A protein has these predicted regions:
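Positively charged n-region of N-terminal signal peptides that target proteins for export
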Residues: 1-7
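Acidic, small-residue rich beta-repeat scaffolds with periodic aromatic anchors
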Residues: 22-40, 56, 113, 117, ...
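Short N-terminal edge-element motif at the start of the domain
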Residues: 35-98
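Recurrent small/Gly-Pro-centered beta-turn motifs in extracellular repeat architectures
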Residues: 51-52, 108-109, 174
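N-terminal alpha-helical modules
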Residues: 215-303
Length: 303
């Protein structure tokens, strides 16, 4: 009996230690939970579980836990903290971005206007370590807008973009504004955050936040987005070409703003030579294909 009590105390202590370290323990697949759409890892091993819409709408409280799961073993690796979302929930969003080697992911929990929380989930055997990075991004963006507006209460939304590599570094670009509803009587301020979080070092190695203009914010937002060319439809090839040309010009303007003068001079020369090649192409379809590739190449420069 004495040994049983001691073992129970040790188990409780271990659970508390894991929680303090941000490590979530494994468990059974929760009832009425489904795999969140587009949350699976590239190798199909892991996914994020959310409560089904039917189950969530039938409960009294408004909170719905979210889990990281091992799909192959049909078990959970643990509850994801500071994330509250159920299937197809209105005015909220949940996005998952996986590293190429599936060893970690970024989970973005969105509210009505921008991200509420942003965390890195690093898989460790049958559990994971959660690191919250959204607070630093939010504070940096708010700081840039406070400086610009001279208002200590100034705050804005966060629209983040991520690139995850096999070097275990999370590259973040985020734009922000304080007036998402675009009220005419509210002066709008904009800001940009650029940062790199090193998982191995457990710290930000690069951070930069600055105020920007409305035009710069719009161009950067297009520049950082992952275009879905394959699933975008147009009435005809001419409309497609016009849309792609507008996108390319926005990304080019983003590069002009963000790059050092010497680096942009090289991009400008490359763009001039590329335009000659495009304009010499007679087929509209072929020109569109050239523009899609050029957009992606210019986007890579922004990172």
């Amino acid at each position: 009996m004495r040994h049983t009590g001691r073992a129970l105390i040790l188990l409780i202590a271990l659970a508390l230690n894991l929680s303090a370290l941000g490590i979530a323990a494994a468990g059974d697949w929760p009832r009425d939970y489904v795999v969140k759409e587009n949350s699976e890892s590239p190798d199909g091993h892991y996914a994020v579980l959310v409560q089904s819409m039917d189950a969530a709408t039938g409960q009294e409280d408004n909170e719905s836990g979210v889990y990281l799961a091992d799909v192959k073993s049909h078990t959970t690796l643990g509850n994801i903290e500071k994330v509250d979302y159920f299937e197809h929930q209105n005015h909220r969003g949940l996005e998952v971005f996986w590293a190429p080697d599936c060893s970690y992911c970024v989970i973005e929990n969105d509210g009505r206007y921008g991200a509420d929380t942003i965390s890195i989930l690093e898989i460790k055997d049958s559990s994971f370590v959660q690191t919250e990075i959204g607070d630093r991004i939010q504070k940096s963006l708010d700081g840039a807008m406070k400086k610009q507006s001279h208002d200590s209460e100034m705050a804005g939304d966060v629209s983040p973009h991520f690139r995850l590599g096999t070097d275990r570094k999370v590259r973040v670009r985020a734009v922000s504004q304080n007036n998402p509803k675009q009220f005419e009587d509210v002066k709008t301020y904009y800001a940009l955050f650029q940062g790199t979080y090193d998982l191995a070092a457990k710290k930000w190695t690069v951070t930069d936040a600055r105020s920007i203009t409305a035009d710069q914010s719009g161009a950067l937002d297009v520049g950082y987005q992952n275009p879905d060319f394959e699933n975008t439809t147009y009435a005809n090839e001419d409309d497609r070409a016009k849309s792609l040309d507008e996108q390319m010009n926005q990304v080019y303007q983003a590069a002009k703003f963000i790059l050092p003068p010497a680096r942009f001079a090289k991009v400008k020369h490359e763009q001039t030579e590329w335009l000659k090649k495009r304009d010499a192409t007679s087929s509209v379809k072929a020109r569109c294909e050239l523009m899609e590739k050029r957009i992606r190449d210019l986007q890579d420069v922004l990172w």
